[in-house]
Structure formats: structure tokens, C-alpha cells
Amino acid sequence: MKFFLSLKDFKGEKFVLRSELDESSAFLCAISPTCRYVLRDEIPWKRLQRNVTSESLTDELIVDLLCGRSESKHTLQLVVLENLCRIYINYVDPFPLRIAWFELEQQALKDHEHFDVLWECSHSIKDLALASMAQQKNELQKLMAYTEQLQEECKSRERKLIMKFADMIKNARNNEDNEDNHHINYEDESDVGTDEQKQQEGVNSSAVSDTDESAVSDEFMQIKEEFPMKALSASPTADASPESAGEDDSHRRSSHESSETVSE
């Protein structure tokens, strides 16, 4: 895979660092408008010169730096010397420190070199763009699939919640109906008890009436035995005698008065 980086030296001269990397080898080429510097090395880096021992400077990190991937603690710096060029790897935390570098040998610049670099750069950009688009498409498909999965889970949970609420409403209605039926049954039992009580009261009242009637009948029979029928039959005449007696007295008095008048 080919990668292109834009670098500047201390004088501000512009360079293009072209890196061709595979599993076991690397080709580095720094090109300016006037010169060209080249380095061929193997991976692991045998021609890398280290200033200090750093465990963090691994082969993977060096490849990432040459490919242009951002790394917050390490940077690349190009310095042009006599007949060579150095690509320094700086450790910037807490202050810039050159921990390793590559030395590229100067070579003659060919007339068609710039065109080849531009052509390779355009194709590299195209390949990177296509690879990036393919990666984004793959990520988008995964995201769409994950979104559909979430939608299905949401629908399933929604259905479960609806069924749960429906069961709760159904149970509540059943409980309400059971309470109403229990209340109605209780009222019916109360009515039945009231009717039975009324019937019992009616029976008791009829028994009392019968008892009273029998008592009156017994009393009447006792009176009948004590007083003869003549007395009972004469009692109305006796009751009516005062009026008739009064009438007889008045009649007698008038007759007596009339007789006295005649005698005179």
C-alpha cells in the first residue's frame, strides 16, 4: 500500500514523503522540487537509529506514523543534511525529544518523477477513498441492521406491555364483576331473610290472633254459663225500659191530671 505525506524542513522547503509498505519491507522516498531521497528497509526496522530506548516506539506505531495516522504523543520531522535527509520521530510529551530517525540517501531526480508521484498520489487517494467508502457502507449496513433489531425489540416490548395492560384491565374488570355479584347475592340473602322474618312475624301474629279469639270465645262461654239465656234475652228490654217507663209515667200523670180536672 502506498501513502503520501506532506512535510517541511526548517527552511520551509516542501517535501512529499512517499511510503510503500507491505508485511516485511518498506520503501521511503522524500521528493522536493529539486532533489530526491530514498531508503529501503525491512520490517522490523533494521536501519532505524534510536537515540533513546523507548518501549512505546513499536513497529506498529512507526507504520502508523508513516501512513499518516494521527498520534498525539509522536510526530515526524524532516531535516535535510549534506547528501542525505533524516526523518526524525519526535516524542512531544512533555517536550519535543528526538528518539529515533531514518536516514535517506540522495539520488538524482528524474524528469518524470513529479508526474509519477502525482499519478500514484491520485490513485492512492482514489483507493483510500474507495476503501473508506466501502468501510462506511459496511458500518452503515451494520448500523441499519442494529437499528432494525432495536425496532423489533421495541415492538416486541410494546406488544408485551399492551398485553400486560390488557390483562391487568381484564383482571380488574373481573374483580369488579365478582364484587358486584357478591354484593347482589348478599342483598338477595338479606331480602330472603327479611321475607322469612316477615313470614315468621305473620305466623306469630296469626297465632296471637287465634289465641285472642280463643280467649274471647272462652270468656264468652264462661259468661254464657254464668248468666241464663233469659237474662241475656231480657237485657235488651231492660236496656230499653227506662225510656218506655218514662213514657208510661208521663201518660199516667196526664191521665191522673185529667181525672182530677173532671172531678172538680
Swiss-Prot record:
Does the entry feature the keyword Glycosyltransferase, yes or no? Answer: no
Q: Where is the composition biased (Basic and acidic residues)?
A: 173-186, 248-264
Query: Which key words are in the record?
Result: Nucleus
Q: Which GO terms describe its cellular component?
A: chromatin; cytoplasm; cytosol; DNA ligase IV complex; nucleus
Renumbered to this chain, region (Disordered) spans 173-264
Q: List localization entries.
A: Nucleus
Segments of skewed composition (Polar residues): 200-209
Q: A GO term (biological process) for this protein? A: double-strand break repair via nonhomologous end joining
Observed phenotype of the null mutant: Spores sensitive to ionizing radiation.
For the keyword Nucleus, the answer is yes
Its main localization is nucleus
Per the record, the similarity remark reads: Belongs to the XRCC4-XLF family. XRCC4 subfamily.
- Fill in the subunit field for this protein: Interacts with lig4; the interaction is direct.
Q: Could you tell me what this protein does?
A: Involved in double-strand break repair via non-homologous end joining (NHEJ); the repair of a double-strand break in DNA in which the two broken ends are rejoined with little or no sequence complementarity.
Task: Please report the name of this protein according to its UniProt entry.
Answer: Non-homologous end-joining factor xrc4
**Organism in which the protein naturally occurs:** Schizosaccharomyces pombe (strain 972 / ATCC 24843) (Fission yeast)
